[in-house]
Amino acid sequence: MDIIRRIEQTMMREDVPPVEVGDTVRVKWRFTERDRSGEDKSRVQAYEGIVIAKKGTGISESIVVRKISSGVGVEKTFPLHSPNLVDLEVVTRGKVRRAKLYYLREKKHLVVKKKSRF
């Protein structure tokens, strides 16, 4: 068991800022696509939204980010220690009273009472 922990420690990223539920974050994620000629192309896409859930610990830690795009709610799960994660920036800090903000799925516009914390 000690071997697994040591391997996980070498794979974990240290440049990931602390993120809590209720924070508004901007995630830059690298996608690799294959074009018609068969070449692999990678591009970076930014995704900004509210963190509605935080799951796991250690190397398996991930966050669920929700945003409204063209009137439709979109949620994406991002592993925090993935090599495809280019940048994670906390835009605003929020203080909420729940561990999971799944009730935002029922709201049309991300109307949530958030206190900003410093």
Curated annotation (Swiss-Prot):
InterPro entries found in the cross-reference section: Ribosomal_bL19 (IPR001857), Ribosomal_bL19_CS (IPR018257), Ribosomal_bL19_sf (IPR038657), Translation_prot_SH3-like_sf (IPR008991)
GO cellular component, one term: cytosolic large ribosomal subunit
A GO MF term: structural constituent of ribosome
Role this protein plays: This protein is located at the 30S-50S ribosomal subunit interface and may play a role in the structure and function of the aminoacyl-tRNA binding site.
Protein name (record): Large ribosomal subunit protein bL19
Keyword terms of this UniProt record: Ribonucleoprotein, Ribosomal protein
One Pfam entry name: Ribosomal_L19
The keyword Ribosomal protein appears for this protein: yes
Annotated family: Belongs to the bacterial ribosomal protein bL19 family.
GO biological processes: translation
